[in-house]
Amino acid sequence: MALPCSFSVALVLLSCHSLCCLACHLPDTHSLRNWRVLTLLGQMRRLSASSCDHYTTDFAFPKELFDGQRLQEAQALSVVHVMTQKVFHLFCTNTSSAPWNMTLLEELCSGLSEQLDDLDACPLQEAGLAETPLMHEDSTLRTYFQRISLYLQDRNHSPCAWEMVRAEIGRSFFSLTILQERVRRRK
């Protein structure tokens, strides 16, 4: 008789947990994958920054989107999702002229794909995003990545241009990782 009672208590606790916590809970491995992506981006460095000085530019990274204090959890989840998609697209579909070590690039793309799988398994409606339109945030990120794509095109996808983009994405992905850590700590 104790077993059915324990089972009932477990069901009640699970129901309360799902009702009380509408936001998506990403697996612990998701955070580790973020740090792995950052490590891989660092290892992909092929050129010194000083040899590409004439390629420097300001991509106007939208820092305000990554302020963990300003964004609700559902909004932060959406920003993380869009940013991860854009980074995946940039590195994993524009590879024909990229100067990367293919082993590192494949590992990076695999890690980003796993992160997207985690995020896709978390429906945005469940995370409370149905009531929180993010047109501004989405548009801002799209514009940021358009600037990066145009920069690569304008410089014919040269190794120095890719190096500047790799460094920029490393900095922006670091901000993304910090945003996720802040949201995670708030729970």
From Swiss-Prot:
UniProt-annotated glycosylation sites, renumbered to this chain: N94, N101
Presence of the UniProt keyword Glycoprotein in the record: yes
InterPro entries per record: 4_helix_cytokine-like_core, Interferon_alpha/beta/delta
Record carries keyword Secreted: yes
Pfam families documented for this protein: Interferon
GO biological process, any: natural killer cell activation involved in immune response
Keywords tagged on the record: Antiviral defense, Cytokine, Disulfide bond, Glycoprotein, Secreted, Signal
Gene3D superfamilies registered for this protein in UniProt: 1.20.1250.10
Cystine pairings recorded for this chain: C24-C122, C52-C160
GO cellular component: extracellular space
A GO molecular-function descriptor: cytokine activity
Signal peptide feature range: 1-23
Compartments where located: Secreted
Family per similarity comment: Belongs to the alpha/beta interferon family.
Function noted in UniProt: Produced by macrophages, IFN-alpha have antiviral activities. Interferon stimulates the production of two enzymes: a protein kinase and an oligoadenylate synthetase.
Protein's UniProt name: Interferon alpha-3
Source taxonomy: Eukaryota, Metazoa, Chordata, Craniata, Vertebrata
